[in-house]
């Protein structure tokens, strides 16, 4: 285990907002990042950007003060998933995720891989049902449960394996907080401020509604990244959340 030089320089934010960086152009991504403040949000780096630009891109974001959610959704045999999660922790990310459908042994191995990192370990979150999926999509896979019921089953398995929480839809958050408790973190994509286009997300909610539902961290993409004034958009979202708290 190595310590990242950037870990001590990152700003602390109390905002639940995580901005999804969905860029295929590095310069465009950095131009956006230069406009926002790490005190107003965290950043999510997904498969496309990580594949294009690698760990060094994450380090650059950390050096600018941002906490990083490394959204790679590891899903592999237990040993491979565990090594991947440990590599993410070594990079100094704030949060990393795996697919709950990888099963109990995989999730337990991932959790154990973070033990040596102690308090510096990232939050380990499991993906339940992707927010783009509907009942018909699950039926195609032979799953007869509704998206909500299947997500709850996977969330229960995630908690049993000792992970920190799950990625879920905002509609599932109320039920999940009741069933799994306040300490079980809920991370929700598909959050759109009032008036935003739904895009490719099927199960969406506004930031205020998500907060009220019990969401701990809300992932917001294009409404911020495509804003004419992203810094002001973030401040407006955070202000609305403070009023709703």
UniProtKB/Swiss-Prot annotation:
Q: What does this protein do?
A: Catalyzes the decarboxylation of orotidine 5'-monophosphate (OMP) to uridine 5'-monophosphate (UMP).
* Residues annotated as catalytic: 73 (proton donor)
Instruction: Give the binding site residues for substrate.
Output: 22, 44, 71-80, 131, 192, 201, 221-222
Which enzyme type, at the first EC level? lyase
Q: In which pathway does it act?
A: Pyrimidine metabolism; UMP biosynthesis via de novo pathway; UMP from orotate: step 2/2
Q: What reaction is this protein's catalytic activity?
A: orotidine 5'-phosphate + H(+) = UMP + CO2
UniProt cross-references to HAMAP family, sorted A to Z? OMPdecase_type1_B
Quote one Gene Ontology molecular function term: orotidine-5'-phosphate decarboxylase activity
Q: Which Enzyme Commission numbers does its entry carry?
A: 4.1.1.23
Cystine pairs annotated here are: none
GO CC, one annotated term:
cytosol
Q: How does it assemble?
A: Homodimer.
The record's keywords, sorted A to Z, are:
Decarboxylase, Lyase, Pyrimidine biosynthesis
Q: Which family does it belong to?
A: Belongs to the OMP decarboxylase family. Type 1 subfamily.
Species this chain originates from: Escherichia coli O127:H6 (strain E2348/69 / EPEC)
Q: Does the keyword Secreted apply?
A: no
Q: Mark the transmembrane ranges.
A: none
Tell me yes or no: is Lipid biosynthesis among this UniProt entry's keywords. Answer: no
Q: What is this protein called?
A: Orotidine 5'-phosphate decarboxylase
Q: What processes in GO biological process is this protein linked to?
A: 'de novo' pyrimidine nucleobase biosynthetic process; 'de novo' UMP biosynthetic process
Q: Which Gene3D superfamilies match?
A: Aldolase class I
